[in-house]
Amino acid sequence: MYELIQVSELCYYIQSPAKIGVVKTAGNDVVLIDSGNHKTAGKKALKLLEQNGWRLRAVFNTHSHADHIGGNRFLQEHTGCKIYAPGIERDFTCHPVLEPTFLYGGCPPSELRHKFLMAQDSNTLPLTPDALPDGMEAIPLPGHSFDMVGFRTKDNIVFLADCLSSRETLDKYRVSFLTDVKACLETLERVMDMDAAVFVPSHAETTADIRALAQYNIDKVHEIADDILDICREPVGFERILQGLFDKYGLSMNFEQYALVGSTVRSYLSWLKECGGLRAFFENNALLWEKV
């Protein structure tokens, strides 16, 4: 863990729970793509940079989830680097309490106010094309998070952030977090058509051919949707839908899973309703969902 792995002449990644991209820009200057899941990750990343004689100029966050921005504040305090994040991800990075608040749908209890869901805040700037090094471009990858992006470097390495997960992760945890099912599927379809020398997903192995994994992720989204429709053959409320999925997949409920999977299931319900697969109605002061 926290091994520096070279991908191309200019690009590396630090193997960690969420890969940290390292891109050489000019001379001994480098930028990072994400900063890891905690200040410890930031410390280890900085140590690797210093061992190679590199100077950190900026961190480009793909999105605002805590496992990608956890090292921001440490790196900023110890190097003075600038930090950038796209769209609404910047607001969540500046104000991390928004993350558990969004997931829970209200003021989050103490069980959701921890480093895995709520990183330390950092002074974060809007990600614009002018902020990127020459030859580096941001690629919109919404779905997993609101305004998530990936990055393509000048030597055609594509960092894919969290737009897809490994087969092992999908098979083990079943429900992969997302905020927008439609956007997620559209992103995966675009990824299927991408070319790169190497793709670097944050939570899967690097590869020169991403198509099979992207298709596997697409299939899993539709599988979950089908399971939700099956649960909704009779009118049923959200809590029962969530319980039914946990029972079917052999998952164990706790506050964190309730928030993460619950938020994701609500996104599926919205998508299925808009697609015409579910109808929603109120009965006896309860919101019920039923397969059409």
Place the predicted regions along the sequence by residue:
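Conserved beta-strand hairpin/beta-sheet module of binuclear metal-dependent hydrolase folds
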Residues: 1-52, 150-162
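A short catalytic or substrate-binding loop motif that flags glycine-/basic-rich loops and adjacent residues
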Residues: 14-16, 132, 141-145
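C-terminal regulatory/interaction regions
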Residues: 230-292
